[in-house]
Regions:
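Active-site rim/loop-helix segments in enzyme catalytic domains that contact anionic ligands
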Residues: 1-124, 255, 267-268, 275-276, ...
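Metal-dependent de-N-acetylase/amidase catalytic core
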Residues: 1-10, 97-98, 102-295
Length: 295
């Protein structure tokens, strides 16, 4: 019997942990679950999206600044640990950064999987959260590679013969993909229209985006209605990446935004404790085999 619940998430860049699943982490952290953030890269290729910080000094020190932002955001959200796998940001597809031998997308797959296996075996989570391979809206090389290494590491971590240098074998019980619910995005777009505010999603809908995004229907919806501030604060901690006046993140009145941000959606990709079905708890089927949350 394990002596604590542990949730490990795998993200590509600093700020991804704030935009994907922050409310879920805040909720489980508040319940006493041990929460671990693994970030693959330092986000060195990220554009400075906050005009107030777009200076020569910030650009020259972007790697160090983004690491500080990551630590600040993780503290606001409720991560107990932050681990960097140590790769360089690969940049967008077909950008010059793709050619850098230090970048994540160019790392040998077995090497990157081994690094993640080591973290899984060290932290010993029951639940791992990562990205799906179906990323039609944002096919960043690092996001696709995160999916690859996460699935492979989930399978390998419990095999003593795989990566024997990476610690004592440990098999997580469930693997989830974090997804943006199309229904929630539609609801947000419609609320912008209803309130007479220009919708940042208008172009998406104009070119048929919802019809191209089908395929992954959420199997789990986690109630995060009490953790709106954690997500908002986590986003704002990434000051170089998040413009506080951004209509995408903050275009709706806060009370309206809070109502629309009531749940976060996931797809269960592996479940070793039972059949995959509708859930409202990522630890469903696991809790009874753990001595005590946070124990």
């Amino acid at each position: 019997m394990s002596d604590r619940l542990c949730l490990l998430t795998v993200h590509a860049h600093p700020d991804d942990e704030a935009s994907k699943g922050a409310g879920t982490i805040a909720r489980y952290h508040a319940e006493g679950v041990h929460t671990v953030l693994v970030t693959a890269t330092g986000g060195e290729e990220g554009e400075i999206l906050n005009p107030a910080l777009d200076t020569d000094e910030v650009r020259a020190n972007i790697a160090a600044i983004r690491r500080r932002e990551l630590d600040d955001a993780a503290a606001v959200i409720g991560y107990d640990e932050v681990v960097l796998l140590g790769y360089r940001d690969s940049g967008m597809a077909d950008s010059p950064a793709n050619a850098d031998p230090r970048c994540f997308a160019r790392a040998p797959l077995a090497e990157a999987v081994g690094r993640l296996v080591a973290e899984i075996r060290r932290a010993r989570p029951q639940v791992v959260v990562t990205y799906p391979d179906e990323q039609r809206g944002y096919r960043h090389p690092d996001h696709l590679r995160v999916h690859e290494i996460s699935v492979a590491a989930f399978e390998a971590a419990g095999d003593p013969a795989a990566y024997p240098f990476a610690g004592v074998a440990h098999q997580p019980q469930k693997l989830y993909f974090t997804v943006w619910s199309i229904e929630q995005i539609v609801a947000r777009h419609e609320k912008f229209v209803e309130l007479g505010i220009t919708s940042p999603y208008a172009e998406w809908f104009a070119d048929g985006w919802p019809n191209r995004m089908g395929g992954l229907a959420p199997t789990a919806r986690i109630d995060v209605s009490e953790y709106y501030e954690a997500r908002r604060g986590g986003l704002l901690a990434h000051a170089t990446q998040i413009d506080p006046s951004s209509p995408f993140w903050f275009g709706l009145p806060e009370d309206v935004d809070r109502q629309l941000y009531s749940a976060e959606a996931y797809v269960c990709a592996r479940n070793l404790v039972g059949p995959i079905g509708a859930e409202d708890d990522l630890f469903a089927g696991i809790r009874e085999n753990v001595a005590a949350p946070g124990g």
